[in-house]
Amino acid sequence: MPGVAVKLYSVFFKLLLKHRLQNLISISAADGLSDSFGVSTRSDESVAAANPSFTDGVATKDIHIDPMTSLTVRIFLPESALSPEPDSLRHKDNYNHQPRSDRRHSYGPNHNSPAPAERNESRRNSYGCNNENLEPYGGYAPSAKRNSRKLPVMLQFHGGGWVSGSSDSAANDFFCRRIAKVCDVIVLAVGYRLAPENRYPAAFEDGVKVLHWLGKQANLADCCKSLGNRRVNGVEVKKLNVQGQIVDAFGASMVEPWLAAHADPSRCVLLGVSCGGNIADYVARKAVEAGKLLEPVKVVAQVLMYPFFIGNNPTQSEIKLANSYFYDKPVSVLAWKLFLPEKEFDFDHPAANPLAHNRSGPPLKLMPPTLTVVAEHDWMRDRAIAYSEELRKVNVDSPVLEYKDAVHEFATLDMLLKTPQAQACAEDIAIWVKKYISLRGHEFSY
């Protein structure tokens, strides 16, 4: 069973969340909150500022990718991208090949495991490069003189019951830094529009938009490699050979330099947390439908962490664990009322139930490999497991990692982020994900 501290925190968490949801419902009913631009973060939530310098092995920056909406992306670039064979990567490989008896099992922490050794190796300075190569803004800037690696890209969709959470929240920043390091990937945390200002399908459309933006960035970067200084249609276009950017006569950058230098979009993974899992699964379906139209972007796998699934016919866990920790069923129902348009409210809505009879999109057999993470004390667990089972029936690699004595968001909630179980979950995800992002080749194809 979860500890006393978790139980107490859960009580206060649910009270505050229920109060917020009820306020949003009343305001939405009275005044209406529809706003096409939307909001991607709440003013009362703790956020972590982006830091383009390498701090604890990761540099971050925020990109506002759609001028018509509040859609943003926070990029998490691991320091391992600066060297073809970083020492930290070798250490990780050695760690991942330890005997299984020395690792936590997939159901939670192994309390007999020794604490990880402190890293004593020398590190680069806070910018990951020599001072003479720094850009004026003081953060990391790719350089043609420096060795670099192409890393897989992971699109991450945060949780928060559709109405809260953000790509730059303190908890999400910590989690994405951890994932970027253990998986050795560039993480793009998506700041999708929240409800009720923007109801379904806004958040889902934002996820697809980021995937297309990633493809556009890759194509622009390729174009930049062959483009010299020239005039196109009377407009001066310049090539910056150090950062791989294309700028117009006004100096506006069209290419994101970190992605141009380090991203390999042909090895793209989706990771969704709670309601973000619903978004990730939707984006995966759209990627399968698009097929080669998305090239060079290729979604090779997805990770669904305790997805926010529900349905009209309650499962055993939905009945037995309805009043479980943090996001219990009554509170989650309020969240769904704020997210789904009133005329579409139905627990068998395709956004809510992945196995609904009215599900659209490609057949399940075409879905990418899917890792599902569930918690023992989460009322949503059975439906997530059922979805995984249906994928396995059509020969999709779809394992389930179930963690004992765990609660919903046990690996991503602010209070629980530094627990051994949260660290173990990230490491288990990394082991599975690396099967599909290895440079030795991909096992999955549309």
Swiss-Prot record:
Q: Which reaction does it catalyse?
A: a carboxylic ester + H2O = an alcohol + a carboxylate + H(+)
Record GO terms (molecular function)? carboxylesterase activity
Give the signal sequence positions: none
- Where is there biased composition of kind Basic and acidic residues? 87-105
Origin: domain of life: Eukaryota
Where on this chain is Involved in the stabilization of the negatively charged intermediate by the formation of the oxyanion hole (motif)?
158-160
Under InterPro entries, the record lists: AB_hydrolase_3, AB_hydrolase_fold, Carboxylest/Gibb_receptor, Lipase_GDXG_HIS_AS
The top EC class is: hydrolase
Give the residue ranges for region: Disordered.
84-131
Which PROSITE patterns does the UniProt record give? LIPASE_GDXG_HIS
Kindly indicate whether the keyword Ribonucleoprotein belongs to this entry: no
Gene3D superfamilies in the cross-refs: alpha/beta hydrolase (3.40.50.1820)
Q: What tissues contain this protein?
A: Expressed in roots, leaves, stems, flowers and siliques.
Protein role: Carboxylesterase acting on esters with varying acyl chain length.
What PANTHER family is this protein classified in? Answer: ARYLACETAMIDE DEACETYLASE (PTHR23024), CARBOXYLESTERASE 16-RELATED (PTHR23024:SF455)
Name of the protein in its database record: Probable carboxylesterase 16
Species of origin: Arabidopsis thaliana (Mouse-ear cress)
Question: What phylogenetic lineage does the species belong to?
Answer: Eukaryota, Viridiplantae, Streptophyta, Embryophyta, Tracheophyta
Could you tell me the gene encoding this protein? CXE16
